From Swiss-Prot:
Belongs to the complex I subunit 2 family. One of its GO terms (biological process) is ATP synthesis coupled electron transport. It comes from Buchnera aphidicola subsp. Baizongia pistaciae (strain Bp). The chain crosses the membrane at residues 8-28, 35-55, 74-94, 103-123, 129-149, 161-181, 205-225, 239-259, 273-295, 301-321, 332-352, 379-399, 414-434, 462-482. GO terms for cellular component: plasma membrane. NDH-1 is composed of 13 different subunits. Subunits NuoA, H, J, K, L, M, N constitute the membrane sector of the complex. Its EC number is 7.1.1.-. The gene is nuoN. The lineage of its organism: Bacteria, Pseudomonadati, Pseudomonadota, Gammaproteobacteria, Enterobacterales. This is NADH-quinone oxidoreductase subunit N.
Amino acid sequence: MIITGQQLVALSPLLILMSIAIVVMLFIAYNRNRYIVFLLTSFGFLSVFISLFIVKKIVPIHATTLFHIDKYSLLYIGIVIISSFLACIFSHYCSLTNYLYNFEEFYLLLLFCTIGCVSIIISNNLCTFFIGSELISLSSIGLISYTFFEKKALEASIKYMVLSGIMSTLLLFGIALIYSVSGSLEFSSIIYELTMITKSFHNAIILFFGVSLFIIACSFKLSLFPFHIWTPDVYQGMSSEALMIFSTSVKIAIFSVLFKIFIVLSYFHIEEVFYYLVSIISCLSMIFGNIMAINQTSIKRLMGYSSISQLGYLFIVLVISRNMQFSLEVTGIYLINYALSNIGMFGIMSVLSSLYKNFNVDSIFSYRSLFWSSPILSGVMTVVMLSLSGIPMTVGFLGKFYLMSLVVKEHMWLFICLFIISTIIGFCAYLKIISCLFVAPSDSYCHKNIIISSQNINNKFLIGLLTTISIFVLFLGIFPQITIHLVKYFWIQW
């Protein structure tokens, strides 16, 4: 197999990440230096982000039979890299300062997880997808159990390891069934063969079970109902910095592949076979996730259930992906909001956990009256929560508005009713956190449990970074044409 120069350039984001991972491993082996490893990792992420502007000049392009890079892929690689870069920054200045040893391995796990995400996004082969998903799973287990001195972290890592192993088996079995009837592992070749296969009832049944197992395994990775059982426990056991990449990059990567597959399926009207399966998963996820989030007193568990509902909203796009241009636009806008909001929320928790050792960052009650002692962090937290709930003047409203418009075009009235009901329920869950922030301080509670003084917040850089994220959330919501033009730029030549 001959690889051309253009193909190497197209694969440069993946090659840069792999090279940086090798260099970091060598530094860890010969000379442990947390600061140098942090700089190398940050340099790698920045280099990948810059390389995207070079790659966009030659896309779309097939880089061997394993990878296909287009503008759609570049958009989500950019989101993944930004999420990983911010997780790297917050981990350096926040959580890793509390660890006694093994600082450097966190960055290595972060790199491996990002490599898995990028390889999945540009994958054009079921083998590439499987290897990438396994790389994500293995590095995620390390990220979950990195705070091994905490009981919840070990419990969460064991749960995720066992369930992830089971789902990997189902995924591999589904891939085997698809290969048995299509004779190919390439996405493009499989879709071509499907047009002939569906005429045979026997092959169609095998194909249906194979694709169904594939969707179920991906639903587990996306923590959708009813494959969500691990989500709240794993979220509660992970550090805030690890959650930045686990809750954004991993899910964006998995969803991007599913979306590309269903877009191609829609050309042959094969996606109608899986209409009911995807619709049921979507509706149950958005209702269940929001209902369970209401009674949570743990913010991480609440964000876990929130992720179930947020991805549940977006999952319905898979069955109406035949309206390709609008579906791509909706997906891009919605995932940009999802990434910004989650990074902002876990960033706040990361800053507070590092600045105040006695601060229970996971309890909602710990944030009681936070506004009166730290108005900036409270403001950022409020903006993030409002964006997740889809309130106007935030980018979250833009995402849900476009999603609703897409559903209305398809006349899916039942989904519209469930969408509105679940959004109202979700807003009540987010409002509980917001109301805690602005409660008037009381001597009997506030001063005994948490005393936050503005002079203690000495790391202005992280506070400024969080403020910038919240400004972006508002700016993109007030001026939606910027977000729309950005997303259109990536799908216009998809």
